[in-house]
């Protein structure tokens, strides 16, 4: 059975993740998970997110909408 403290930790981690998502943005012009290298740059280089051009994991453009120009 999951303890109350474990649930609390999970909630805090989820809140931190949501705050980070709001700050960086999944579709935030090259500043989401596919854009840690700077504006318009994903891990794979210019115009790339995790999964390639415009498609990250689950088919989402993690690199943002304004990258790869």
From Swiss-Prot:
Subcellular location: Secreted
Modified residues (Tyrosine amide): 29, 39, 46, 53
Induction text: Upon D.coniospora infection.
Residue list for modification Tryptophan amide: 58, 67
GO biological process, one term: neuropeptide signaling pathway
Protein keywords: Amidation, Cleavage on pair of basic residues, Neuropeptide, Repeat, Secreted, Signal
Signal peptide coordinates: 1-22
GO cellular component terms, semicolon-separated: extracellular region
Record family assignment: Belongs to the YARP (YGGW-amide related peptide) family.
Function: May have antimicrobial activity. May play a role in response to fungal infection.
Protein name, entry field: Neuropeptide-like protein 30
Native source organism of the sequence: Caenorhabditis elegans
